[in-house]
From Swiss-Prot:
Recorded domain comment: The histidine box domains are involved in binding the catalytic metal ions.
Name under which the protein is recorded: sn-2 palmitoyl-lipid 9-desaturase
Keyword Kinase: no
Organism: Nostoc sp. (strain 36)
Origin superkingdom: Bacteria
Length: 285
């Protein structure tokens, strides 16, 4: 990604308004997730663990983030689309929205107006309130697509960005057929809530706590427990220093599960042009 996204930065706008439909949507999912213990089964718990990894590590971390947002490696188009579909099923937004917002975050990290989830506005803002008080320039398609023109010109990504929410319906029906209500509650509601917070911790906790290996221009930090629940994304100081690298864990103790999957794809000949080291002479990204 070499485009100068700062040149199309959104204007510093007015105070955002609370969007109740977002509050109700996330509130209902959290309430239903709390009912999960009444539908417990060991198979449902196993499904939860598997889907948290599949949608979190493969769909979001590997797909939406390292592949689509930063282009740190390449895969065949059919595989790219399949991984993006898995990312859409994570219910964290369509690919154009997610990638566009993340690129805005990197272009204007911690700017209180231009970073969609600036940590300078506090833990809860960067964690979830940025969704409850949405700024049009971050949630309007015609605006955020400017940050992801490579995706916006592809019909598949436009379709996925529009209909990602509806994909949960056939997915939930499939889970019901396979395992009844326990699979629905653990595979949809509880899985969504846990994965949402796992991802949000990268925006909030990893900009507040942890250690800094590199003297980057922002407050991103390396936080071990966030890396556990996000499969390697918690090594955030490393990532903000070298955002186009396919791996975030740079030392042996910085476990990066998503990087293992990329290495497997590379071994199978499916991942090409993998960026596994900083650009020569680079100090930060």
């Amino acid at each position: 990604m070499t485009a100068n996204f700062g040149a199309i930065a959104p204007e510093r706008g007015n105070s955002p308004q609370l969007r109740w439909i977002n509050v109700v949507f996330f509130g209902v999912f959290h309430a239903l997730a709390l009912l999960s213990p009444w539908f417990f089964s060991w198979s449902a718990l196993g499904l939860l663990v598997f889907l948290h990894w599949l949608f979190g590590s493969i769909g979001i971390c590997l797909g939406y983030h390292r592949l689509l947002s930063h282009k740190s490696f390449q895969v065949p188009k059919w595989l790219e689309y399949a991984i993006a579909l898995i990312g859409a099923l994570a219910l964290q937004g369509g690919p154009i929205f997610w990638v566009g917002g993340h690129r805005q975050h990197h272009a204007h990290t911690e700017d209180i107006d231009l970073d969609p989830y600036s940590a300078q506005k506090g833990f809860w803002w960067s964690h979830i309130l940025w969704i409850f008080y949405p700024r049009p320039e971050f949630f309007d398609y015609d605006t955020y697509k400017k940050y992801a023109p490579d995706l916006a010109r592809q019909p598949f990504y436009c379709w996925l960005d529009r209909y990602f929410l509806l994909l949960q319906i056939p997915f939930a029906l499939l889970l019901y057929v396979l395992g009844g209500w326990p699979f629905v509650f653990y595979g949809v509601f509880l899985r969504c809530v846990l994965l949402w917070h796992s991802t949000w911790f990268v925006n909030s906790a990893s900009h507040l706590w942890g250690y800094r290996t590199f003297d980057a221009d922002d407050g991103a930090r390396n936080l071990w427990w966030v890396s556990i629940v996000t499969y390697g994304e918690g090594w955030h100081n490393n990532h903000h220093t070298y955002p186009h690298m396919a791996k975030s864990g740079l030392f042996w103790w910085e476990i990066d599960v998503t990087w293992w999957s990329i290495q497997l794809l590379q071994t199978l000949g499916l991942a090409k042009k993998v960026v596994s080291s900083p650009p020569q002479g680079a100090t930060h990204g």
